[in-house]
């Protein structure tokens, strides 16, 4: 059995699986997931070589953390065998990036996850807060938690790419260890590429999420609330239909496209069933043994060309 490739994450010394386990679906965000299924999914992912699990108290109003905690506990392996990231600042009730809330947040998360520490604690979707508060209050609070051993490393997440440079230019080097970007490294949008040299120069590890663009590049299509423009939605639909007509799965192609760039340490994919885990792992191992289906990829890229790198607004206006 091919083990999934492990990649170095910035300067952290962590080695994360090229595919990471996105645990938001365990919070029944996209439909109900039974506890037994959640536990079985985590177990299968770990068995097949996925060692990196990502969650947040926001996903499913804390349910994702609880389910992931149960799944990890059931593995009955040493804590150092897996890497866990959770987040703070975004909750079902809204956003709160204050030092006080962050302190409370990690204690609550650790209890739900049944862990003594997390490997990475991210500020979640910082474009919805004041970036200056993130720099002057939130990140220093996270540094304190790092000193106390509640998290090993600190990260920031969000959609607009300029939030990363804004914060990283204003905090001491080595303060932020990791960034998590989503929807900016996939077949339809690869704008994260432009930022990679900058992030490398800062010694910051890069995690990319949503290679399927939050459902745009799937046969079932995006959820009703998806913020993409009608143009982007219809081009994506055409790309999906093209793959289907050739008997190919766009999800596999899209995931492989994201995985092919080794500068990105891990690509997070949401998983809520054993079959999804197996499908994702097969995509990785096939990429390593057979390479990409270049012909279909070129055809899909041609269909998406008119909407390439189109994104959508996210966050509040920063003055």
Curated annotation (Swiss-Prot):
Record-linked InterPro entries: AKR, LGALDH-like, NADP_OxRdtase_dom, NADP_OxRdtase_dom_sf
Record-given protein name: L-galactose dehydrogenase
Deletion phenotype: Lower leaf ascorbate concentration with accumulation of L-galactose when grown under high light conditions.
PANTHER family named among the record's database cross-references: GH17980P-RELATED
SUPFAM superfamilies in UniProt: NAD(P)-linked oxidoreductase (SSF51430)
Domain (SIS) ranges: 122-269
Protein's job: Catalyzes the oxidation of L-galactose to L-galactono-1,4-lactone in the presence of NAD(+). Uses NAD(+) as a hydrogen acceptor much more efficiently than NADP(+).
Organism of provenance: Arabidopsis thaliana (Mouse-ear cress)
Record-listed E.C. numbers: 1.1.1.316
Reactions catalysed: L-galactose + NAD(+) = L-galactono-1,4-lactone + NADH + H(+)
GO cellular component, one term: cytosol
């Amino acid at each position: 059995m091919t083990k999934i490739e492990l990649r170095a994450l910035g300067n952290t010394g962590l080695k994360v699986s090229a595919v990471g386990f996105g645990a938001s679906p365990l919070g029944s965000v996209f439909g109900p997931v039974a506890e037994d299924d959640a536990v079985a999914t985590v177990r299968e992912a770990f068995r097949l070589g996925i060692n990196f699990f990502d969650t947040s108290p926001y996903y499913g109003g804390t349910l994702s953390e609880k389910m992931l905690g149960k799944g990890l506990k059931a593995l009955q392996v040493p804590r150092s065998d897996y890497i866990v990231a959770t987040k703070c600042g975004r909750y079902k009730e809204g956003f709160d990036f204050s030092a006080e809330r962050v302190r409370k947040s990690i204690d609550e998360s650790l209890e739900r996850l049944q862990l003594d520490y997390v490997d990475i604690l991210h500020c979640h979707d910082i474009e919805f807060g004041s970036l200056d508060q993130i720099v002057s209050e939130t990140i220093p609070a996270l540094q304190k938690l790092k000193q106390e051993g509640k998290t090993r490393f600190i990260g920031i997440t969000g959609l607009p790419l300029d939030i990363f440079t804004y914060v990283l230019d204003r905090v001491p080097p080595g303060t932020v260890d990791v960034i998590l970007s989503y929807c900016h490294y996939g077949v339809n949008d690869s704008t994260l590429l432009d930022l990679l040299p900058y992030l490398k120069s800062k010694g910051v590890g890069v995690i990319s999420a949503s290679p399927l663009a939050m459902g745009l590049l799937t046969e079932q299509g995006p959820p009703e609330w998806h913020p993409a423009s009608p143009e982007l939605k219809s081009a994506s639909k055409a790309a999906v239909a093209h793959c289907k007509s050739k008997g190919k799965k766009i999800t596999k192609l899209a995931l492989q496209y994201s995985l092919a760039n080794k500068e990105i340490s891990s690509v997070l994919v949401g998983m809520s069933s054993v079959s999804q885990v197996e499908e994702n792992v097969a995509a990785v191992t096939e990429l390593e043994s057979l390479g990409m289906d270049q012909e279909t990829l070129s055809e899909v890229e041609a269909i998406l060309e008119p909407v390439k790198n189109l994104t959508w607004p996210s966050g509040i206006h920063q003055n």
